[in-house]
């Protein structure tokens, strides 16, 4: 019997149903002018800064979403959450913990220097209560703060390891707000 070895490998492409060419064409020029189409499918090709640029482009796409019945929504927008989850996992080092909730208290404290003027623990627990602009600000701040770091820190274990799933839960309501 062959041993199965567990590896920490995050696959971004292909996400079934996602039209990568349309995704590329939908990204703002500040993003698409600095990446190639294969960069969207293979994060190994790009630097940490480029990964952040792509994630910011995805937040832009989610913020400026079309109607849910639009072909663009069906081929790109409804897949943005899964794409962001995978891409952020890769940015943070590939280790992803979907089984536990983020430590809201610790995350709240981490956000104080940048978003302390308005962010509340209640908003962090219930992102659908935030306005479209507040969700975008929070997502942009997460991207700005995200980095691959040592996995033996409390911050990594309680916040960043769980962040891809949390990020997905924040970007989802953005796709449905008008």
From Swiss-Prot:
Keywords: Host cytoplasm. The keyword Disulfide bond does not apply. Coiled coil: none annotated. One of its GO terms (cellular component) is host cell cytoplasm. It comes from the Viruses. Belongs to the tenuiviruses NCP family. This is Major non-capsid protein. It comes from Rice stripe virus (isolate M) (RSV).
